[in-house]
Amino acid sequence: MLKTRIIPCLDVADGRVVKGVNFVDLRDAGDPVDAAIAYDAAGADELCFLDITATHENRATMFDVVTRTAEHCYIPLTVGGGVRSVSDVRALLLAGADKVSFNSAAVANPDVVAQAADQFGSQCIVVAIDAKTTSPGKWEIFTHGGRKPTGIDAVAFAQTVTAKGAGEILLTSMDRDGTRAGFNLPLTRAISDAVNVPVIASGGVGTLDHLVEGVTKGGASAVLAASIFHFGDYTIAQAKQHMSDAGIPMRLI
């Protein structure tokens, strides 16, 4: 049985790690390369960098962060934020990313997922879905850092992009992000049940039990968290042991 992965997420703005609450009120949680090295040493299974201020002007900053991280870290690195084209994917893979995540660009043009998967393989193409609850059992995709409603159903979109070749879904509940109230489990379960690729649950982790629930109740293949790790509430080792004790297969440190 495949092991469940724990993935610390580093939101990067202007070359620094920040952690927002509901995508605002950013806090400085340090240098991304230092944080990545620390997480690698601590036993994280993968890392995720999201460039939340991605613009043409600061792309060079992010490429530098990715290159320096890849030089020091040996766990898989997923990079997203401002990824718009196959050439963006190529540039990030060459810089040292193992996987590249589309978000808004995949909503605007799902075929970009197919183009990237055809060139580089589904195993390195992730689609990040930011969803908000609109009514019980219904979730809508928002883009541009959660500011722009799309009218697109999250479950249907997940099925569309996996059919196009996405090898993984990074699912963030925007209602829960930064709240520490736990994952949106109905959303996570609905997406996990609807697709045949791994789903990474994101948004809302406040306790180690929340990580367990993302897998046992949400059906996720991996769990992503930021603030509980960034600010020292729990270590990766504690999280892995807690999940293992709950019967979840983990790569223990």
Swiss-Prot record:
It catalyses: 5-[(5-phospho-1-deoxy-D-ribulos-1-ylimino)methylamino]-1-(5-phospho-beta-D-ribosyl)imidazole-4-carboxamide + L-glutamine = D-erythro-1-(imidazol-4-yl)glycerol 3-phosphate + 5-amino-1-(5-phospho-beta-D-ribosyl)imidazole-4-carboxamide + L-glutamate + H(+). CDD domains: HisF. GO terms for biological process: L-histidine biosynthetic process. It comes from the Bacteria. GO terms for cellular component: cytoplasm. Coiled coil: none annotated. Keywords: Amino-acid biosynthesis, Cytoplasm, Histidine biosynthesis, Lyase. It holds the Pfam family His_biosynth. Disulfide bonds: none annotated. Pathway: Amino-acid biosynthesis; L-histidine biosynthesis; L-histidine from 5-phospho-alpha-D-ribose 1-diphosphate: step 5/9. Gene3D superfamilies: Aldolase class I (3.20.20.70). GO terms for molecular function: imidazoleglycerol-phosphate synthase activity; lyase activity. Its EC number is 4.3.2.10. IGPS catalyzes the conversion of PRFAR and glutamine to IGP, AICAR and glutamate. The HisF subunit catalyzes the cyclization activity that produces IGP and AICAR from PRFAR using the ammonia provided by the HisH subunit. Heterodimer of HisH and HisF. Belongs to the HisA/HisF family. This is Imidazole glycerol phosphate synthase subunit HisF.
